[in-house]
């Protein structure tokens, strides 16, 4: 189950806890297609193992939970299908995590941006350190956009005005603001977060599994009822990903310079 970049570990069966650690700290835990697939496989394992009661996701190195998708792969995008296939792949991964039948906790240290932010939002609870930052800064970096489902996750937690604020400005919100907005459940100092998350997970794991499952699935169904099919947003995905601005954003990011966007 584990790979060098995705470490999956199940505690002693008596605890009921499973942990996934994204282990690519040299790249701020940026995700590749293989890493996304390993996350899906971990979700399958969690659902298949009755001894697992709670699933915790975290990033190695202390500087990033996950910083999203490895930007280098975007240099290969040239067609509408490239863009749609990428967003559908990411949607499938995040949706699979969201559908895990056991409670999930994102343990966030450092940044959770782009796809990493989407993964954190797909978890049931988020516990972070004071230095954590959340956001999807594509308006000032790459010039692309999110899938309908990932916009919906932001809307569920932040509401329309705050979602637009976050996306329009491209800013990252710190831990204190994230907690005020309801995005984060708890803030814990870095030297105590492992123990705090383990204690929270153990508390949940002692409770009635069917009640936990029913609560999680009921909330998911209620939220899903407000979402549109991704196909209804394909025109917006293609508009952004096939633009000159997106090509400029990717080139600028890889060259470590500010992008110059022209709206075309």
Language model: regions and residue ranges:
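Conserved CoA-thioester-binding segment of acyl-CoA-metabolizing enzymes
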Residues: 1-58, 95
């Amino acid at each position: 189950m584990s790979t060098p970049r995705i470490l999956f570990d199940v505690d002693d069966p008596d605890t009921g806890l499973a942990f996934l650690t994204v282990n690519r700290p040299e790249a701020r835990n940026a995700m590749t297609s293989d890493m996304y697939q390993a996350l899906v496989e971990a979700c399958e394992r969690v659902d298949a193992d009755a001894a697992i009661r709670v699933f915790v996701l975290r990033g190695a190195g202390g500087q990033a939970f996950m910083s999203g998708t490895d930007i280098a792969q975007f240099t290969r995008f040239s067609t509408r299908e490239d863009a749609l296939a990428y967003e559908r792949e990411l949607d499938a991964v995040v949706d699979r995590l969201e559908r895990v039948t056991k409670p999930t906790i994102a343990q966030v240290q450092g940044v959770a941006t782009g796809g990493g932010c989407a993964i954190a939002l797909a978890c049931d609870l988020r516990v972070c350190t004071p230095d954590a930052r959340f956001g999807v800064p594509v308006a000032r970096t790459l010039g692309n956009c999110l899938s309908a489902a990932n916009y919906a996750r932001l809307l569920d937690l932040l509401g329309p005005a705050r979602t637009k604020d976050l996306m329009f400005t491209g800013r990252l919100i710190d831990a204190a603001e994230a907690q005020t907005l309801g995005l984060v459940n708890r803030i814990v100092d870095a030297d105590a977060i492992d123990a705090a998350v383990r204690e929270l997970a153990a508390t949940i794991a002692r409770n009635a599994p069917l009640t936990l499952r029913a609560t999680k699935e009921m909330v998911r169904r209620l939220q899903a009822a407000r979402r549109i099919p991704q196909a209804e947003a394909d025109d917006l995905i293609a508009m952004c990903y096939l633009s000159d601005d997106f090509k400029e954003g990717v080139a600028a990011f890889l060259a470590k310079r500010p992008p110059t966007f022209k709206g075309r």
